[in-house]
């Protein structure tokens, strides 16, 4: 009986192996909610989230659940800008309506239930959701001293106004973090009401709305922009500080809890086996550091391991040092 139930749960989560199959599924499931898990077999957190999906599939038979190996169908992953696993996309009427990055089972459950209900919540539930959203928006607007809510990313703006805003901030060497409103429809709509500002991009400093592109242009013209927004340290200075942040620093895809590529996962396992304390930096979260560190250390790939600010090397070198018995003395600063 238990085995049969497990098989039914697995069967409820379809697997997609090609771009053509994915497009066909979007058409076939257009009238229902489609939840797609972009996963990788090397990431244990993906296996856990597959189990969560299987449980949700049993509870919500009207929802279609699909898993797609991100590296196995790269054209689909690139189209939807999947840069890490696990990532979940939500579709209705063949259109993407929401996104969730990371292994967050409670958030996945909440999003699936909300989209599956299509506005059929009781008023009390709606009020509760509104309260949750406002709390989330407050956290997002305070996520960095200067936060830009835009269409796309600073590297790939997806509208002319967002592109101009990024250019102005870069021109004035302003340090900012960004949020892609296309990645989360709930935030996109909710922030308009939260700040009584109907358009994007929106710039916040210390959680307070400064304004959109026109306001920023006015502040630039009146030379007030430089006094309002925090300045970014020069990249080389920043990289020097980062590489010296801890005695042993690993620059990787992901973090200690969630490696987001096979090479990073392997180097974590090696470092963990030494018992030496180390810190990590997720290069997927900062494109400037990701590109700048390659030139700074003349090393083109990741992960990169540093001891006392000096580059040791990547995975292959760390493997060699371990085999030769040299890794531990280097990590301890004895060499």
Curated annotation (Swiss-Prot):
Is the Secreted keyword given for this protein? no
Q: What is the effect of changing residue 261 to S?
A: Loss of 2Fe-2S-binding. Loss of 2Fe-2S-binding and interaction with BOLA2
Q: By its UniProt entry, which InterPro entries does this protein fall under?
A: Glutaredoxin, GRX_PICOT-like, Monothiol_GRX-rel, Thioredoxin-like_sf, Thioredoxin_domain
Locate the Glutaredoxin domain: which residues? 144-236, 237-335
- Report any Pfam family annotated for this entry: Glutaredoxin
Q: Which terms does the UniProt entry file under GO BP?
A: [2Fe-2S] cluster assembly; cell redox homeostasis; intracellular iron ion homeostasis; iron-sulfur cluster assembly; negative regulation of cardiac muscle hypertrophy; regulation of the force of heart contraction
The entry's localization annotation reads: Cytoplasm, Cytosol; Cytoplasm, Cell cortex; Cytoplasm, Myofibril, Sarcomere, Z line
Q: Which residues carry this modification: N-acetylalanine?
A: 2
Tissue expression per record: Expressed in heart, spleen, testis and, to a lower extent, in thymus and peripheral blood leukocytes. Weakly expressed in lung, placenta, colon and small intestine.
Cellular component aspect of the GO annotation? cell cortex; cytoplasm; cytosol; dendrite; iron-sulfur cluster assembly complex; nucleus; Z disc
CDD domains, alphabetized: GRX_PICOT_like (cd03028), TRX_PICOT (cd02984)
Q: Which residues does this entry mark as bearing Phosphoserine?
A: 117, 120
Question: Where is the major localization of this protein?
Answer: cytoplasm
* Keyword annotations: Acetylation, Cytoplasm, Iron, Iron-sulfur, Metal-binding, Phosphoprotein, Repeat
According to the UniProt entry, its GO molecular function terms are: identical protein binding; iron-sulfur cluster binding; metal ion binding; protein kinase C binding; RNA binding
- Gene3D superfamilies in the cross-refs: Glutaredoxin
Q: Where is the Thioredoxin domain?
A: 2-117
**Quaternary organization:** Homodimer; the homodimer is independent of 2Fe-2S clusters. Heterotrimer; forms a heterotrimeric complex composed by two BOLA2 molecules and one GLRX3 molecule; linked by [2Fe-2S] clusters. Interacts (via N-terminus) with PRKCQ/PKC-theta. Interacts (via C-terminus) with CSRP3. Interacts with CSRP2.
Print the domain comment field. The thioredoxin domain lacks the two redox-active cysteines. This strongly suggests that it lacks thioredoxin activity.
Q: What does this protein do?
A: Together with BOLA2, acts as a cytosolic iron-sulfur (Fe-S) cluster assembly factor that facilitates [2Fe-2S] cluster insertion into a subset of cytosolic proteins. Acts as a critical negative regulator of cardiac hypertrophy and a positive inotropic regulator. Required for hemoglobin maturation. Does not possess any thyoredoxin activity since it lacks the conserved motif that is essential for catalytic activity.
The miscellaneous comment for this protein is: Silencing of Grx3 in HeLa cells decreases the activities of several cytosolic Fe/S proteins, such as ACO1, a major component of post-transcriptional iron regulation. As a consequence, Grx3-depleted cells show decreased levels of ferritin and increased levels of transferrin receptor, features characteristic of cellular iron starvation.
Specify the protein name.
Glutaredoxin-3
């Amino acid at each position: 009986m238990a085995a049969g139930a497990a098989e039914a749960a697995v069967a409820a989560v379809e697997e997609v192996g090609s771009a053509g199959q994915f497009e066909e599924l979007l058409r076939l499931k257009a009238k229902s909610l489609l939840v797609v898990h972009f996963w990788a077999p090397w990431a244990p957190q993906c296996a856990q989230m597959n189990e969560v999906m299987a449980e949700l599939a049993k509870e919500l038979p009207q929802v279609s659940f699909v898993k797609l190996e991100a590296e196995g169908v790269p054209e689909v992953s690139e189209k939807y800008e999947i840069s890490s696993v696990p990532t979940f996309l939500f579709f209705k009427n063949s259109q993407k309506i929401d996104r969730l990055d990371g292994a967050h089972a409670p958030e996945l459950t909440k999003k699936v239930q909300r989209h599956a209900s299509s506005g059929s919540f009781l008023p009390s539930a709606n009020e509760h959701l509104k309260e949750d959203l406002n709390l989330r928006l407050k956290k997002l607007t305070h996520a960095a001293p200067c936060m830009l809510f835009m269409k796309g990313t600073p590297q790939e703006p997806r509208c002319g106004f967002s592109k101009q805003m990024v250019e102005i901030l870069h021109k004035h060497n302003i340090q900012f973090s960004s949020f892609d409103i296309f990645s989360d429809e709930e935030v996109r709509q909710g922030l308009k009401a939260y700040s009584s500002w109907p358009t994007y991009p929106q710039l916040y400093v210390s959680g307070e709305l400064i304004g959109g592109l026109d306001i920023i242009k006015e502040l630039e013209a009146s030379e007030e922009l430089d006094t309002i927004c925090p300045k970014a340290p020069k990249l080389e200075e920043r990289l020097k500080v980062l590489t010296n942040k801890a005695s042993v620093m690993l620059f990787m895809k992901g973090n200690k809890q969630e490696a987001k590529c096979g090479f990073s996962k392997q180097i974590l396992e090696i470092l963990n086996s030494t018992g030496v304390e180390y810190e990590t930096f997720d290069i997927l979260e900062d494109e400037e550091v990701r590109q700048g560190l390659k030139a700074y250390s003349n090393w083109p790939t990741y992960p990169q391991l540093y001891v006392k600010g000096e580059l040791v090397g990547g995975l292959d070198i760390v493997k060699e040092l371990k085999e030769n018995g040299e890794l531990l003395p280097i990590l301890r600063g004895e060499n």
